[in-house]
From Swiss-Prot:
It comes from the Eukaryota. Residues 649-658, 833-851, 908-919 have a biased composition (Basic and acidic residues). Type I collagen is a member of group I collagen (fibrillar forming collagen). The lineage of its organism: Eukaryota, Metazoa, Chordata, Craniata, Vertebrata. This is Collagen alpha-2(I) chain. Residues 17-60, 145-166, 211-232, 276-286, 330-346, 381-400, 505-522, 534-544, 577-621, 628-648, 666-676, 697-706, 760-787, 795-805, 853-898 have a biased composition (Low complexity).
């Protein structure tokens, strides 16, 4: 058995019936020592830990409570939470089995208050609770209830400490772990730590905090729980407090404690960075952990943590890992924040926190917020940031180039500046190709384009027209047409395009031929410069704008990605050509742009002149963006450069910085989009066309090219998120891992009672008994299992008079506990067996109890020589055992005949309650009363039958049965209801004595 003395467990009522003989069940064996507690198990990720709460379950183990003490520290836990490690020990709490009791731990919730839990500190142990996480182990989970404690969990916050928590593992003791739940909380707060985590990895620690939380709590929990609980230990609560301590933890968590460090960052975890907490881990040993709880106080700081928010996610992530850092726990002090931890309660929830470990991250999680670290996390976003970089590609966005028309928007481009980066875009040069054009559209961003500005070149914008076209380029499609590039020429103007709008003029695209300029188109990106578009005047040509449709091609913009090209912007100088952009007006032809394919013209042909087309600016849809990129060739439009004057516009170029976006610059390639020139038609935007002059910029447009990307640049903003990147750290969280051993499962609960035994099958009719051989000594009864709850007993049947004993019928034995020794006495003839009463309902099976010791056997009456056993009749199904009727007087026992074959075992009926035992047969034949039966545990699963005792030596043989055949079975007395194990009905009349039965097997 679990080694537990279950006596404390309520025993189900034993109907027991006479059973009597049964012999007292021996005392249960001593309970085995509780198994070792399981390994605390690594702290769960803390973060989650909050979840941990669940760990609480483990609380059960708690009983060992141990926990209690365990809990104690909690406070420290603060960081030490780590120490939580020791928590492991908490594990033992496992035993706590009781821990279950820990359930009460729920009160742990109270733990909330637990904050005070600080005390909980001890809860700390709980930290170990963290481990409580382990609480997982908690399977006992129930204790988990305790998790409630977990509420205390809030304390959990301390959890951050929890980080330390990890150590919390120890928390494992988690049962405490129960507390663990608290830990949950912990995690949350811990989360902050998570912040830490951020760096946290530490943060992650937080996670540990998780556990911390847990732990924290855990401590509590578990501890308490079971801790104590003793089982009951209950302790409850765990002392919940301990957990509470957790609370303290909360504090810790409190934020962060993590943040604790960060303190404010708290959450932010940012600090999380503090991840340093990393160190956290170390503390783990702290095991003290619990202590930490107090730190938790610090937790106050935690509040600061909020800011941590920022980390929010970030932290979390990280931290989680950190959890281990839990050590950081110290920061845990911050835990003081613990209060915040309170929130931890929720941590309870954390139960799951188990994972809570994760919680570490959870920590943040706790913060859920990402809380704290998470905040940081955002930064992680930033990581994204980089992403934005990609956006650059968005350069493709260049597509927007079409927008380019909006080119004007370009101004916005300024932001593009940021794009500066875009320059890099320059590299985008290549972007120049078409994408640019798109960009052109981008242009607006074009402003960025201006970026192109960088391009100043923006002016190239004219080509920008191109750009327009570029946009068109977008049209790029055209671009595809790229060829359209021809118009692309316009494209050049395209840049202006941005003003492009004029891209429509891309129509001019017709001019497209200028397309060559289109080449310039690339500049188009600068198109954004297009803003320059002012010159839009040229826009008139914008008329061509219609062609803008072509702009669709802008599609091309895609190419924009190349934005990298953005660099290109330099080229923007070319913008001069932008003038050509005017041509853009020409753009009208832009429609022609479709021909874009002519893109080949790509020369870019000086056609820049086409710039005028810019006016067409209308922008074709350009949106397409498209392909145009290819049109890139249009770039030639350069000639359009004349427009360059507008180049001045180029100033806009300044925007160029936007260029950063320029990266998108690559979009610049959109310039190719120039072909989009058709967009030229967009030229109208062309007015912007004037921009055409900017077209000049166009050349610069080239740079502009970049510009377009610039817009992408806009995208840049996302960059910020990049910060989130930090989050990445989070990774550590892992630490949590330790969840610690699962803590031992607590010792097994007391064994359940043995379930009731099914009624025994009715015995087959016994053949006439042969002369009884000497009765072998009964084997020692096996230890009875604890009785399971027993079903209601059936009423006892009235015992029939005992008929003469027939041979004993051999029914399949019900599983029965060992029988008590049979008292001596001759068996009277068996009365009829009483009818079996209806079977009692089976009680729920109790835990299998340990087998009780067999009762002492009563003295064995001398058995008559066994007659041959009659054949055993088939076993009837077990009927419900009726209550046994009174036993009739037993007739003299005939010699036992040889034992007949056993009948088939009847189905076991439900075990009825044992009926009262009928009176025994008269002495002489009467069988001695059985010794008192030990309580029959309800039969759980039947215990194994003890080996039969050796059969005593055979008594003198009675006269041989006639032939040893089974005598007729005596009438079977009514079967008494089978009590737990009803006594065996009297034997039927003896058959002719058979030869002595063989000695019983031992």
């Amino acid at each position: 058995s679990g080694g537990f003395d279950f006596s404390f467990l309520p025993q189900p009522p034993q109907e027991k019936g006479p059973m009597g003989l049964m012999g007292p069940r021996g005392p249960p064996g001593a309970s085995g020592a509780p198994g070792p507690q399981g390994f605390q198990g690594p702290a769960g990720e803390p973060g989650e830990p909050g979840q941990t709460g669940p760990a609480g379950a483990r609380g059960p183990a708690g009983p060992p409570g141990k926990a209690g003490g365990v809990v104690g520290p909690q406070g420290a836990r603060g960081f030490p939470g780590t120490p939580g490690l020791p928590g492991f020990k908490g594990i033992r709490g496992h035993n706590g089995l009781d821990g279950l009791k820990g359930q009460p731990g729920a009160p742990g919730v109270k733990g909330e208050p637990g904050a005070p839990g600080e005390n909980g500190t001890p809860g700390q142990t709980g930290a170990r609770g963290l481990p409580g996480e382990r609480g997982r182990v908690g399977a006992p989970g129930p204790a988990g209830s305790r998790g409630s404690d977990g509420s205390v969990g809030p304390v959990g916050p301390a959890g951050p400490i929890g980080s330390a928590g990890p150590p919390g593992f120890p928390g494992a003791p988690g049962p405490k772990g129960e507390l663990g739940p608290v830990g949950n909380t912990g995690p949350g707060p811990a989360g902050p730590r998570g912040e830490q985590g951020l760096p946290g990895v530490s943060g992650p620690v937080g996670p540990p905090g998780n556990p911390g939380a847990n732990g924290l709590t855990g401590a509590k929990g578990a501890a308490g729980l079971p801790g104590v609980a003793g089982a009951p230990g209950l302790p409850g609560p765990r002392g919940i407090p301990g957990p509470v301590g957790a609370s303290g933890a909360t504090g810790a968590r409190g934020l962060v404690g993590e943040p604790g460090p960060a303190g404010s960052k708290g959450e932010s975890g940012g600090k999380g960075e503090p991840g340093s907490a990393g160190p956290q881990g170390p503390p783990g040993s702290s095991g003290e952990e619990g202590k930490r709880g107090p730190s938790g106080e610090s937790g106050s700081t935690g509040p600061t943590g909020p800011p941590g928010l920022r980390g929010g996610p970030g932290s979390r992530g990280l931290p989680g890992a950190d959890g281990r850092a839990g050590v950081i726990g110290p920061a845990g002090a911050r835990g003081a924040s613990g209060p915040a931890g309170v929130r931890g309660p929720s941590g309870d929830t954390g139960r799951p926190g188990e994972p809570g470990l994760m919680g570490a991250r959870g920590l943040p999680g706790s913060p859920g917020n990402v809380g704290p670290a998470g905040k940081e996390g955002p930064a992680g976003l930033p990581g994204i940031d980089g992403r934005p970089g990609p956006i650059g590609p968005a350069g493709a966005r260049g597509e927007a180039g079409n927008i380019g028309f909006p080119g004007p928007k370009g101004p916005a481009g300024d932001p593009g500046k940021a794009g500066e980066k875009g320059h890099a875009g320059l590299a985008g040069n290549r972007g120049a190709p078409g994408p640019d054009g798109n960009n052109g559209a981008q242009g607006p961003p074009g402003l960025q384009g201006v970026q192109g500005g960088k391009g100043e070149q923006g002016p190239a914008g004219p080509p920008g027209f191109q750009g327009l076209p570029g946009p068109a380029g977008t049209t790029g499609e055209a671009g595809k047409p790229g060829e359209r590039g021809i118009p692309g020429e316009f494209g050049l103007p395209g840049p202006a395009g941005p003003r492009g709008e004029r891209g429509p003029p891309g129509e001019s695209g017709a001019v497209g031929p200028s397309g060559a300029i289109g080449s310039r188109g690339p500049s188009g990106p600068p198109g954004p410069d297009g803003n320059k578009g002012e010159p839009g005047v040229v826009g008139a040509p914008g008329t061509a704008g219609p062609a803008g449709s072509g702009g669709l091609p802008g599609e091309r913009g895609a190419a924009g990605i190349p934005g990298g090209k953005g660099e290109k912007g330099e080229t923007g100088l070319r913008g001069e050509v932008g003038t050509t952009g005017r041509d853009g007006a020409r753009g009208a032809p832009g429609a022609v742009g479709a021909p874009g394919p002519a893109g080949a013209t790509g020369d870019r042909g000086e056609a820049g002149a086409a710039g005028p087309a810019g006016p067409a600016g209308p922008r074709g849809s350009p949106g397409e963006r498209g392909e145009v990129g290819p049109a890139g060739p249009n770039g030639f439009a350069g000639p359009a450069g004349a427009a360059g004057q507008p180049g001045a516009k180029g100033e806009r170029g300044t925007k160029g910085p936007k260029g950063e976006n320029g990266i998108v610059g690559p979009t610049g390639p959109v310039g190719s989009a120039g072909p989009a020139g058709p967009n030229g038609p967009a030229g109208p935007a062309g007015s912007r066309g004037d921009g055409g002059p900017p077209g000049v910029t166009g050349f610069p447009g080239a740079a502009g090219r970049t510009g377009p990307p610039g817009p992408s640049g806009i995208t840049g903003p996302p960059g910020p998120p990049g910060a989130a990147g930090k989050e990445g750290l989070r990774g550590p969280r892992g630490d949590q891992g330790p969840v610690g051993r699962t803590g031992e499962t607590g010792a097994g609960g007391p064994p359940g009672f043995t379930g009731e035994k099914g009624p025994s099958g009715e015995p087959g009719t016994a053949g006439p008994p042969g002369t009884a051989g000497p009765q072998g000594l009964l084997g020692a009864p096996g230890i009875l299992g604890l009785p399971g709850s027993r079903g209601e007993r059936g009423l006892p049947g009235v015992a029939g008079a005992v008929g003469e004993p027939g041979p004993l019928g051999i029914g399949p034995p019900g599983a029965r506990g060992p029988s008590g020794g049979v008292g001596p006495g001759v068996n009277g003839a068996p009365g009829e067996a009483g009818r079996d009463g209806p079977p009692g309902r089976d009680g729920l099976p109790g835990h299998k109890g340990e087998r009780g010791y067999a009762g002492n056997a009563g003295p064995v009456g001398a058995a008559g020589a066994p007659g041959p056993h009659g054949a055993v009749g088939p076993a009837g199904k077990h009927g419900n055992r009726g209550e046994p009727g009174p036993v009739g007087s037993a007739g003299p026992v005939g010699a036992l005949g040889p034992r007949g074959p056993s009948g088939p075992q009847g189905i076991r009926g439900d075990k009825g309650e044992a009926g009262d035992k009928g009176p025994r047969g008269l002495p002489g034949g009467l069988q001695g009363l059985p010794g008192l039966a030990g309580q029959h545990g309800d039969q759980g699963a039947p215990g194994p039958v003890g080996p039969a005792g050796p059969r005593g030596p055979a008594g003198p043989s009675g006269p041989p049965g006639k032939d040893g055949r089974t005598g007729h079975p005596g009438a079977v007395g009514p079967a008494g209801i089978r009590g737990s194990q009803g006594s065996q009905g009297p034997s039927g009349p003896p058959g002719p004595p058979g030869p002595p039965g063989p000695p019983g097997a031992s």
